[in-house]
Amino acid sequence: MSNYVVAMEAAWLVRDVENSDDAIGVAVSEAGKRLNDQDLDYVEVEAGVTGCPACGEGLDAAFLAANTALVGLVLELTVFNADSDEHAQRIAKSEVGGALRDVPLEVIDVIEDGDAPAEEA
């Protein structure tokens, strides 16, 4: 059994905001609060980055229209003692998905973590 770092992308809807910086701040705060309420404080929440189609430069993953924003968030956690990377993905989506109901989640990266000590089963 191995440990895996699983990164997921979440689409977070924020209403009544006037700029993308405010939308990102609200999205990160709300996601963090919902995760912490479910004792998932080990999940890291960050604003997502998307590449500019013209130049490839990284841009904040936030789209704003009519004072409503869709913010892309990156959620990252370590899954201990998983049988495979697919097993780690299922565990991560189950843990985070339970706290963030009705929030679309997609696994974007899974890395086997050889540095983290395995927890006792």
Swiss-Prot record:
It holds the Pfam family DUF555. Belongs to the UPF0212 family. PANTHER family: UPF0212 PROTEIN MJ0068, UPF0212 PROTEIN TK1194. InterPro entries: UPF0212 (IPR007564). This is UPF0212 protein VNG_0879C. It comes from Halobacterium salinarum (strain ATCC 700922 / JCM 11081 / NRC-1) (Halobacterium halobium). NCBIfam families: PRK03922.1 (NF003035). It comes from the Archaea.
